Amino acid sequence: MYKTSRVVFSPRVRKSPYFNSTLKYGVQAFSVYNHMYMPTSYEGTVEDYQNLLNGVQLWDVGVERQVQIKGRDAEALSQFLTPRNIKKCSKGQAMYAPFLDFKGGFINDPVMLKIEEDCYWFSLADGDALLWVQGIAAGYKFDVDIREPDVSPLQVQGPNSKELMVKVFGDWINDLGFYRFKEVTHKSIPIVIGRMGYSRELCYEIFLQDHSKGDELWEILWEAGKDLNISAGTPNIILRLEGGILSYLADMDRTNNPYEVGLEWMVDLEQEDDFIGKEALREISHSGPTKKLMGAEIAGEPITVFNEEHWPVLIDNKTIGSMNALVYSPRLDKNIAYVILDIKHSKSGQEIVISSPEKEILAVTVDLPWLERV
């Protein structure tokens, strides 16, 4: 595999409000996500993982850009964009609300925050979903204002995250429910604090509403966390796979629908409101999916390489799917992977062969997830 030796910074790719802080605290690698630099490693994948599990960790996830939909038709457009029934969502509540195309394929898989009755944020995965939303709004003549607001998330992850958040922001954090959020101002810094995040661990997300305050917010949290074993980290593939969490464009894209990747629970075909892809999903619900995302376990020594593309999955020398992600889990003490397989081969306990560029790897399918949410 070829290794990237350096990243060249330029005005073409944006920096998050926490960019200087990530450099100060030792970031070693970046990727590009939503046209921004995203930290991907500090001490290494396993070391960053262990640091999180033994303390509290700050993640610069400013790359999670927001699409703000505001106006008279904000609820109607938001509902049209997702198969979730957002009318069940109240002000101060968040909801996983993927965008689908007219064939039921994934455009993006954001988390929606209901800020006001006429204002919604969609916290995006990678991709130009802002343009999709603007196009749908214009084509269907929704009366809304759509923009990317000055909002940059910072995640606080790990077993000591609640203690840190209470220490900085107050005891009300103890009463903040899962996927609930509150808008506050702390030391003149406007933020939204939510009980959510990109792992199954105890975690919070702080949505900074003034990009000039990024380093200041980081330092407030860092100073308060020095006695809580604080470290800097990034979204971690080990945590993601252990918890059965999906990554858009890595695990699913426009060629996949919710029924293939275990997200059928979020499709509400009984709601009265129409949404993009509803008829296509109704047909898929009736006929059944043709593929299914599953876990796989691989015996042997810890695998230390990462797949840079999807690897074929074989049975009897015939390709029956692909492996999307692979990692060794220290906590489970096993190699684990995501595979998406033809539906007839998607039973748990199925022996498969993963064809890597170097060799063929024997594996056995399992149901997801390996670990439940803390």
Regions found by a protein language model. Name each.
Residues L58, F80, K88-S90, P98-G105, ...:
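Short, charge-rich binding segments
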Residues M1-Y25, A29-T40, M112-V374:
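Conserved, structured C-terminal
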Residues M1-A97, G105:
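Acidic, proline/glycine-enriched N-terminal capping motif
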